[in-house]
Swiss-Prot record:
Protein name (record): Hemagglutinin
Biological process, per Gene Ontology: clathrin-dependent endocytosis of virus by host cell; fusion of virus membrane with host endosome membrane; fusion of virus membrane with host plasma membrane; viral budding from plasma membrane; virion attachment to host cell
Lipid attachment residues per UniProt (S-palmitoyl cysteine): C557, C564, C567
Residues in compartment: Extracellular: 18-531
Keyword tags: Clathrin- and caveolin-independent endocytosis of virus by host, Clathrin-mediated endocytosis of virus by host, Disulfide bond, Fusion of virus membrane with host endosomal membrane, Fusion of virus membrane with host membrane, Glycoprotein, Hemagglutinin, Host cell membrane, Host membrane, Host-virus interaction, Lipoprotein, Membrane, Palmitate, Signal, Transmembrane, Transmembrane helix, Viral attachment to host cell, Viral envelope protein, Viral penetration into host cytoplasm, Virion, Virus endocytosis by host, Virus entry into host cell
Entry superkingdom: Viruses
Residue ranges annotated as Cytoplasmic topological domain: 553-568
UniProt GO MF annotations: host cell surface receptor binding
Quaternary context: Homotrimer of disulfide-linked HA1-HA2.
Gene designation per UniProt: HA
Family affiliation: Belongs to the influenza viruses hemagglutinin family.
Cystines in this chain: C30-C484, C68-C295, C80-C92, C113-C155, C299-C323, C491-C495
Keyword ATP-binding: no
Location within or outside the cell: Virion membrane; Host apical cell membrane
C-alpha cells in the first residue's frame, strides 16, 4: 500500500516538473507580439470596440480662426456681394477687373444702389464666381430714340445721383418718345460673353408714363437658342432707400459666333458691355465672417482654414480647395497596429515565460513581432524585423490607398436662393444632406473594413512566423501550446539567433535532441495530456491515502486496538 502511494506521488511530481519547464533545464524560445498598457479602440465589421496597439485618427476637427490667402488667391468683398460688384454698385468700384480663386462674401455686405432682385440669383452668382474675375469689356451700343444714363437718388456716388456703372438706364427722349429699340450685338470673339441687363418695374402708372411714355412696356432679349420676354409689373412696393420701384436683373450667355438682340418699347435697363467668362478656372465664392490672415492653407471653410493631411474633416460642410471630405462622425480610427493583448503580471504558468497565445509583450519597442528565450546563458528578447516589416508594408499601403481614395479635391459651396425659390432651396438642402449621410456611412464602412483586414493581416503574420519556427525545429523541440517551444538540446545564444534568422539546421542537433527526449520522458506528452496526468496523479494519491487510513481503522477495530462507542 505504501509503495502505491509513493508511485502516485512520483508520477505527480514528474508531471509537475514537465509543466513548469524548470526542472529539465532545457532552453525555451517563445514567439510574441508587441503590446501596450493602454491600447486604442477601433471599429471593425464585427465589433465596435477592438483594442489595437496603435491607430491613426482620420477625422480632422481642428482649424485656424482665419482665412489663409495662400496658396489660394482671396478677394475680400467687404461691403459688396459678388453680384453688386458685377453690377457696379457705388462702393464696389474697387472690385472692377479683379481676379480670384475664392471671392469672400461678408454677411455684413449691403446693397447701395437702386433696389433690385435677381430671379436666377444662384446661377448668376455661380457663373461669376467660377469665372474667377470681373473682367469687363465695354462696348459701344447705339440706343436710338431714347435718353441714356439715367440715375437715381438711391444710388449716390460721390454725393451725386448715379446708377450701376455696368448698366445704362434708358428713358424717353427729350421729344417725349421712346424708341422702339432694336439692337444686335454679335460675339466675334473666342470666349463666352455674359451680358447683364434688367427690366424696371415702376411704382405707379404715372411713373411708367413719365419715364417711358407708353402705359405698358416690354423687353425681349434673344439669342439663337434662347428668348425671354418680360412685361413690367407696375405697382407700389415697400420703400427701400426711399424707392418703391424695383429692377429685375437678368443675364444672358452668348457663345462665340452667336448674337444677342435687344428689343424694347420701354423699361429696358441696358448693358454697357459684357463680362469675359472663362470655363477653365475652378474659382468659387465663400461666405464667411472670418478675417483674412497671413497664413498658408490649401483648404478654406466658412469657419476658418484647415491644415491637415487627414482624409476626412468634421469642421464644416462648406469647404473649398484641397480639403478633406466632410463627414458627420467626429472620429474614425484606422488601425495601424495589431490587436492589443496586454501582458500579465506573471508571465506564463508558475512565472515561466509565455508566448503570443497567452499574452502580448510590453516593451518590444523595435518591432511588432519578436522572440523571447531562456537558456543556460540567461534570457533575452529580440524583434523579428522581417515579419514586422511585412505587416508594416501592408498597413502603410492600406493607409496610402485609403487616403488616395478620399484625397480628390473636395469642393462644396454654400448655395443661395431668392425667397421665391424656397422649394428649390429645400430640395437642394435635402440632396446635400443625403450626399453627406451617404458619404459618412461609406467612410465608416470603409474604415471598419480596413480595420478588420488589418487585424487579420497582423494575426496572419504572427501565425506565419510561428509556422516558420516550428518547421525549423521539427522534432528537436516540443510545442508547448502557448506560443513557446521547449528545445531538447543545448542551444546557446548563437543557436537561438539562428532560429530567429532562419538559418537553424535541425540535422545538427537531431541526435542530441532525441537522446534528451528519451532521458526526460520516454513518452512524449502534449500540453493538454500533461494537465490531465497532473490531476489524475493527484487524485490517485488522495484516493490511496484515504484508503490506507480506512484500512488501518478496520484492522485496528478487528484486533481490538480501537473501540468505537456510539451514544444516542
Amino acid at each position: 500500500m505504501i509503495a502505491l502511494i509513493l508511485v502516485a506521488l512520483a508520477l505527480s511530481h514528474t508531471a509537475y516538473s514537465q509543466i513548469t519547464n524548470g526542472t529539465t533545464g532545457n532552453p525555451i524560445i517563445c514567439l510574441g507580439h508587441h503590446a501596450v498598457e493602454n491600447g486604442t479602440s477601433v471599429k471593425t465589421l464585427t465589433d465596435n470596440h477592438v483594442e489595437v496597439v496603435s491607430a491613426k485618427e482620420l477625422v480632422e476637427t481642428n482649424h485656424t480662426d482665419e482665412l489663409c490667402p495662400s496658396p489660394l488667391k482671396l478677394v475680400d468683398g467687404q461691403d459688396c456681394h459678388l453680384i453688386n460688384g458685377a453690377l457696379g454698385s457705388p462702393g464696389c468700384d474697387r472690385l472692377q477687373d479683379t481676379t480670384w480663386d475664392v471671392f469672400i462674401e461678408r454677411p455684413t455686405a449691403v446693397d447701395t444702389c437702386y433696389p433690385f432682385d435677381v430671379p436666377d440669383y444662384q446661377s448668376l452668382r455661380s457663373i461669376l464666381a467660377s469665372s474667377g474675375s470681373l473682367e469687363f469689356i465695354a462696348e459701344q451700343f447705339t440706343w436710338n430714340g431714347v435718353k441714356v444714363d439715367g440715375s437715381s437718388s438711391a444710388c449716390l456716388r460721390g454725393g451725386r445721383n448715379s446708377f450701376f456703372s455696368r448698366l445704362n438706364w434708358l428713358t424717353k427722349a427729350t421729344n417725349g418718345n421712346y424708341g422702339p429699340i432694336n439692337v444686335t450685338k454679335e460675339n466675334t470673339g473666342s470666349y463666352v460673353r455674359l451680358y447683364l441687363w434688367g427690366v424696371h418695374h415702376p411704382s405707379s402708372d404715372n411713373e411708367q408714363t413719365d419715364l417711358y411714355k407708353v402705359a405698358t412696356g416690354r423687353v425681349t432679349v434673344s439669342t439663337r437658342s434662347d428668348q425671354i420676354s418680360i412685361v413690367p409689373n407696375i405697382g407700389s412696393r415697400p420703400r427701400v432707400r426711399n424707392q418703391s420701384g424695383r429692377i429685375s436683373i437678368y443675364w444672358t450667355l452668348v457663345n462665340p459666333g452667336d448674337s444677342i438682340i435687344f428689343n424694347s418699347i420701354g423699361n429696358l435697363i441696358a448693358p454697357r458691355g459684357h463680362y469675359k467668362i472663362s470655363k477653365s478656372t475652378k474659382s468659387t465664392v465663400l461666405k464667411s465672417d472670418k478675417r483674412i490672415g497671413s497664413c498658408t492653407s490649401p483648404c478654406l471653410t466658412d469657419k476658418g482654414s484647415i491644415q491637415s493631411d487627414k482624409p476626412f474633416q468634421n469642421v464644416s460642410r462648406i469647404a473649398i480647395g484641397n480639403c478633406p471630405k466632410y463627414v458627420k462622425q467626429g472620429s474614425l480610427m484606422l488601425a495601424t497596429g495589431m490587436r492589443n493583448i496586454p501582458g500579465k503580471q506573471a508571465k506564463g504558468l508558475f512565472g515561466a515565460i509565455a508566448g503570443f497565445i497567452e499574452n502580448g509583450w510590453q516593451g518590444l519597442i523595435d518591432g511588432w513581432y519578436g522572440f523571447r528565450h531562456q537558456n543556460a546563458e540567461g534570457t533575452g528578447t529580440a524583434a523579428d524585423l522581417k515579419s514586422t516589416q511585412a505587416a508594416i508594408d501592408q498597413i502603410n499601403g492600406k493607409l496610402n490607398r485609403l487616403i488616395e481614395k478620399t484625397n480628390e479635391k473636395y469642393h462644396q459651396i454654400e448655395k443661395e436662393f431668392e425667397q421665391v425659390e424656397g422649394r428649390i432651396q429645400d430640395l437642394e438642402k435635402y440632396v446635400e444632406d443625403t450626399k453627406i449621410d451617404l458619404w459618412s456611412y461609406n467612410a465608416e464602412l470603409l474604415v471598419a473594413l480596413e480595420n478588420q483586414h488589418t487585424i487579420d493581416v497582423t494575426d496572419s503574420e504572427m501565425n506565419k512566423l510561428f509556422e516558420r519556427v516550428r518547421r525549423q525545429l521539427r522534432e528537436n523541440a516540443e510545442d508547448q501550446g502557448n506560443g513557446c517551444f521547449e528545445i531538447f538540446h543545448q542551444c546557446d545564444n548563437n543557436c537561438i539567433e539562428s532560429i530567429r534568422n532562419g538559418t537553424y539546421d535541425h540535422n545538427i542537433y537531431r541526435d542530441e535532441a532525441i537522446n534528451n527526449r528519451i532521458k526526460i520522458n520516454p513518452v512524449t506528452l502534449t500540453m493538454g495530456y500533461k494537465d490531465i496526468i497532473l490531476w489524475i496523479s493527484f487524485s490517485m494519491s488522495c484516493f490511496v491515502f484515504v484508503a490506507l487510513i480506512l484500512g488501518f481503522v478496520l484492522w485496528a477495530c478487528q484486533n481490538g486496538n480501537i473501540r468505537c462507542q456510539i451514544c444516542i
